[in-house]
Amino acid sequence: HVFARESITAAKLNELFSAYSNVHIGLVPDIVMSANAILLGTTDCVAPLGILRCLRDDKEAALSAEQYSMIDKALAATGHTIEKTDTHAGGSQLNEAQCTKLLTDKLSQFRAAKLVVTDRLHGMILSLLSGTPCLVLPNSNHKIRQTQLDWLRNHPRLVFLELDEIADIATFIDSLLSVPHGRMDESPVDIAEYDDLKKALVAI
């Protein structure tokens, strides 16, 4: 069994393993979306304040300098405090306690925001786990867009904005700022989406 977390990769795997009848290709959401913030040890915070900006600055970024400027101008115009963050923690050879603290601290940071603006896959997922409304932008690969299309198309606290829509980003920011936070004991996707994975694991 080989499981992909979005349909483009699943199609590539089906093509790659087409000659091997003993290889089953499955499709399930990113495994992190099977959890929720409470299960991951995060507690609720005071009333959410400010906007969290979690945008790539590496080779996987798809935004131009002009688009970054548009985004920052629109965020500043809200009058809210803007905090910049990333989902890459750095470091290596971390023990379990250190990893747990990094994750719970990051979830708490996302929960404490009124809105998250991100082009990172796990920035989007952390937003959904924390119940915080999220404005999602594309990056240079298909993963974040296809994850949204496959599993999160109708999520009430998520808006995916294409690059040619960034000129209108202020409208989407204002709309999402009025969306209330979700509960922290809810998973972003229906747990039944993982049934095929569960069956495969039981059969091992």
Description of each model-found segment:
Residues 1-204:
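Active-site anion-handling motifs in enzyme catalytic cores
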